[in-house]
Amino acid sequence: MHIKPEEITSIIKNEIKNYEKELETVDSGTIIQIGDGVARVYGLEECMEGELLEFPNQVFGMALNLEQDNVGCVLLGSEEGIKEGDIVKRTGKIVEVPVGEDLIGRVVNSLGQPIDGKGPIKNDGYRAIEVPAPGILERSSVNEPLQTGIKAIDSMIPIGRGQRELIIGDRQTGKTAIAIDTIINQKGKDVICIYVAIGQKQSTVANIVNTLTEEGAMDYSIVVTASASESAPLQYIAPYSGCTMGEYFMNKGKHVLIIYDDLSKHAVAYRTMSLLIRRPPGREAYPGDVFYIHSRLLERAAKLSKENGGGSLTALPIIETLAGDVTAYIPTNVISITDGQIFLETELFNAGQRPAVNPGISVSRVGGNAQIKAMKQVSGTLRLELAQYRELASFAQFGSDLDKDTQARLEKGKRLIEILKQDQYKPMAVEKQIMIIYAAVNNFLLDIKVSDIKRFEKEFLEYMDTHHREIGKAILDKKVLDDELKSALESAIVEFKKIFLM
């Protein structure tokens, strides 16, 4: 085929005319040092604090230290195959996690990726893990109860929706058990539960997931886990990821319960990370902003006003103490951030009182407003009577010649202690709690042997279920014990006692 010279020039002109060069400008830098899950990158001039950076092998990192000539980053993945001299690109985004209804019933890692082998998750988009907490005008006061199903807590240390209540105690005192019982008790109450496991053994998390599945609680729960084998940065972002997933539902007007298990390990992960990127250490080698990492997380728990949908996010952070020392750095920090604490004691646990709640130093600063009036009526004197019993019991060890009044108080105290004991994974409905506590507080159990109290409670509640279901229903409907309801309850107790003591 013969082409004329003028045709060649016109073809070249057309090609030049239609030529489009696609240029992509990417702010990139070079790794100058890498190791222990931490990298120093030179050349990222415009990098922002907390920005997501793209490393080779599809590994992402987070910029934490913005220094004069380099950026200190932590890797959110394996550093395998990444070396000095490799190129790092900016993404212009901060760490985000997927949110949506499909996360319910799933087990995910701190980046929201499924790890339960049930396939991919369809999400409703991505949200940043760090967002400002709701402001004062967006909130309303805590006024709805969040029932834990645990008698000792619902009666003396009530929790409201939107509250932050710390669960604190030594290892092996039943902190996680209280949290799991609370999740199980939300069945049928239209509350979405999120359990965040930070630095836990994978076997422990597997047991918790199995328990929740057996109890039917995974139908409304999400489990976020950053196990002990994962890097410190992934453990550090886990609670923020869980909180973001919860906020999605809260902003839709739903009620959410989130458990951080536990923030002691979270603080240790942050300390590890900070020391590796050479931040100056402070008290107990924690960095200076360790208070802020927990306050900005827990401030995101809120009860939103009606104008903002009326949703709520209730946080139950867990802190592990050493030898019962609540005056250590992290425990005092979190106590000052939260709206109260449930203190669990090793001595009580070993003495067979489970849950091992110490009502003397446990407190709920805002939950009282949310407690239903009927429970307030029956539990009003409970804390005081238990405190008096403990005091008298310690004196009674020294002598046996006690007057009748003291003996009666001691006998009543023993029965109150027995009533507050509860088996694990057996949360109790609030109307049943009210009935049995009413019987104990109003001296109906003094002629029942202490060893028979547990059996009495079980059989009494079964009896009320079969013969006097209307009383429980009336307590739920009225939410207050009026004279008519009191006399009906008292006659039912007397009626059952006759059968029991036969």
Swiss-Prot record:
The record marks S362 as: Required for activity. InterPro entries: ATP_synth_asu-like_sf (IPR023366), ATP_synth_asu_C (IPR000793), ATP_synth_asu_C_sf (IPR038376), ATP_synth_F1_a_nt-bd_dom (IPR033732), ATP_synth_F1_asu (IPR005294), ATPase_a/bsu_AS (IPR020003), ATPase_F1/V1/A1_a/bsu_N (IPR004100), ATPase_F1/V1/A1_a/bsu_N_sf (IPR036121). It is an enzyme of class 7 (translocase). Its main location: membrane. Disulfide bonds: none annotated. GO terms for molecular function: ADP binding; ATP binding; proton-transporting ATP synthase activity, rotational mechanism. ATP binds at G169, D170, R171, Q172, T173, G174, K175, T176. One of its GO terms (cellular component) is proton-transporting ATP synthase complex. PROSITE patterns: ATPASE_ALPHA_BETA. It catalyses: ATP + H2O + 4 H(+)(in) = ADP + phosphate + 5 H(+)(out). It is found in: Cell membrane. The keyword Transcription does not apply. Its EC number is 7.1.2.2. CDD domains: ATP-synt_F1_alpha_C, ATP-synt_F1_alpha_N, F1-ATPase_alpha_CD. Belongs to the ATPase alpha/beta chains family. F-type ATPases have 2 components, CF(1) - the catalytic core - and CF(0) - the membrane proton channel. CF(1) has five subunits: alpha(3), beta(3), gamma(1), delta(1), epsilon(1). CF(0) has three main subunits: a(1), b(2) and c(9-12). The alpha and beta chains form an alternating ring which encloses part of the gamma chain. CF(1) is attached to CF(0) by a central stalk formed by the gamma and epsilon chains, while a peripheral stalk is formed by the delta and b chains. Produces ATP from ADP in the presence of a proton gradient across the membrane. The alpha chain is a regulatory subunit. This is ATP synthase subunit alpha. It comes from Clostridium perfringens (strain 13 / Type A).
